[in-house]
């Protein structure tokens, strides 16, 4: 819920945010956090993200698509618990879900809208390959991001659409 409440704060609690969480326990926790932070512009729903675009077509100016991922960015070599359940099958299953979520998010965006695609993983399949899929199949484009981040790395574009160099 921290991304949701941070966006509400950045918007000075003016506007509207629809936050969707599939997991019921996490959804209830998000509702609680939103309430405790006084983020009155946030409506929290609990539905499959793949259905959001169909229910809310051409509705949103901006979408933050924070997808479920393999979490490779959180692996600690010193802690086997952080990676013991990782598998290539899990990654492939997540890729299929991520594509469906991306399609739904694009459907929910107004024409000319902006979307941020977010993961906490490091692999190409869940990052560059998903965005490349969207460029080729969903009529989206990647815009350059001018933001100062410590240790920022450009996206990999070799073998993909050249605009992927603008991803971080």
Task: For each feature predicted by the language model, list its residue ranges.
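S-adenosylmethionine
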Residues: 1-168
